[in-house]
Amino acid sequence: MSGSRSTLPAADLARVVVFAAFIAVLGLFPGFGGVAGVPIVLQNVGPILAGAILGWKLGTASVALLLALTAIGLPLLSGGRGGLAPFVGPSAGFLIGWLLSALVTGLIVQRARTRTLPVLLVACLAGLLADYLIGMPVLGLVVGDLWSGFVQSLVFVPGDLIKVVLAAVIATLVHRALPDLLPTPAREPRVR
């Protein structure tokens, strides 16, 4: 009996689960400082790495799995946070932004003809900006002033830029070691 239901191959499912677990492990490193109840954490590099290594579809799926498990109560976020509270507090926009972060990073990496450090730096930076695109305005709404939310979010930028470089280096090494991990777009012939 064949249906129209598509299935995820076992290897892809394993990659999604392992990366969701990896992002959860990054949450074991305690957050510190931050602004308006949003801590500075290592965990936000996980979605960027997921997109950079697994591509947009599997990377986004791994983040969605982590967020779903968190929402049902597992304490998978930095500081042992879980349940619905993180999704309605000051971190909410950044958490939801993780989905967009993995998606944007993964799309750029998958569409790139090469997976060199400069390409991966651009992809990872774009993923970070995608997270900020959602996180900063939501933080602004929580603190009661969009501009204030933007300014307060600037405290995250230096550390996040270091994490972006680290993610790009790791992803470059992974793609160098496993060049067929993601399909590469076909090169179009040059017209002379």
Each model region followed by its residue ranges:
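Hydrophobic alpha-helical transmembrane segments
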Residues: 13-18, 45-49, 59-65, 91-96, ...
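Structural signal for the C-terminal ends of transmembrane alpha-helices
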Residues: 53-57, 104-112, 173-178
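Hydrophobic transmembrane alpha-helices
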Residues: 1-60
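Alpha-helical transmembrane segments of multipass membrane proteins
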Residues: 23, 27, 62, 70, ...
